[in-house]
């Protein structure tokens, strides 16, 4: 192939004869693309959004990047602000016109890539996700208009939530640090609100005017307005659940005249200790209102152990993720025990005095109390009537199987504690 008919392309760029491979950072095992320079070029048209049509002299072997350079030469628009569309497809810089079957007198469409333009997502309560083209400088009001264009929902019925905050119409996306591919939540503003009650630990009841679409954070602000309690010291409980700031009242099915309970998050937390099976003790800064799940996250931050592999024991009880330290009466300088939940458990046997043998699925990190519960599930014997013996020792409720070196297929002995008896 004669050199004058060859065009070499690398990384979307046509290579110039006088330059070296090093100039283009071409390294070993790089791949160049060879396209043939067709004798004689062709004309194509580029139509802009304003309706203006530009005529360009090109060759089938030109890359899209080359075409953008020609448009820059004619119109002064930088290539990185150009998007070229043909047959409904956005053209990629490194491909050639021939790759897209663009022939003489084809028409391309030029769309300008807005500086700061980006896509964001809007998720509705029904779970539907809408994609919007926006700019950081768009106001919340602009965004609501775009949603109206797509979904037909009037702006005055829309409330947009991001990071647990309701967005105000006059502010911009940049004001809220909303970046590309952020997800906003759309809740509908129900016409007419409702009253709910908030009961404090002192027994005082506060009445609030709210809407179903209010976030928990909004409710905390209303409580602050009435009572002067900062939101970060408030915990709201409904139906036994602690409410999360970013969720709405509707999410929790809180209806008119529902009663929420307000618990104060004590300023200034406390220290607790967590002791591992290796004997290492970790110190954590916590609050009484922290959930067990929060504590496991803090342990993960310090030790790198995933929460789902952690089991926390206090006073012989395994702690449940959704409960708070206060629920278990864990106070400052209490010591929790951390046992690792080994992936995949093991079988052990429990032999009764009648000679019957029960098989149980357990983990080394199970406490003796857990084992007694499993025996109760199988045999109906209340834990307080069970005594479990292994290697001649009576096992204590708060200890784990690992503490007693009970391994797979070990046999424990079950002795019944006689009601009213004393040993």
UniProtKB/Swiss-Prot annotation:
Glycyl lysine isopeptide (Lys-Gly) (interchain with G-Cter in ubiquitin) cross-link, chain position(s): 89
Keyword annotations from UniProtKB, A to Z: Cytoplasm, Isopeptide bond, Nucleus, Repeat, Ubl conjugation
A GO cellular component entry from the record: nucleus
Membrane-spanning parts: none
Cross-link (Glycyl lysine isopeptide (Gly-Lys) (interchain with K-? in acceptor proteins)): 117
GO molecular-function term, one example from the UniProt record: mRNA binding
Family: Belongs to the ubiquitin family.
Organism, as annotated: Acetabularia peniculus
Ubiquitin-like domain span: 1-41, 42-117, 118-193, 194-269, 270-345, 346-421
UniProt subcellular location: Cytoplasm; Nucleus
Function: Ubiquitin exists either covalently attached to another protein, or free (unanchored). When covalently bound, it is conjugated to target proteins via an isopeptide bond either as a monomer (monoubiquitin), a polymer linked via different Lys residues of the ubiquitin (polyubiquitin chains) or a linear polymer linked via the initiator Met of the ubiquitin (linear polyubiquitin chains).
Name of this protein: Polyubiquitin
InterPro entries (alphabetical): Ubiquitin-like_dom, Ubiquitin-like_domsf, Ubiquitin_CS, Ubiquitin_dom, Ubiquitin_ubiquitin-like
Additional comment: For the sake of clarity sequence features are annotated only for the first chain, and are not repeated for each of the following chains.
Propeptide residues according to the Swiss-Prot or TrEMBL record: 422-423
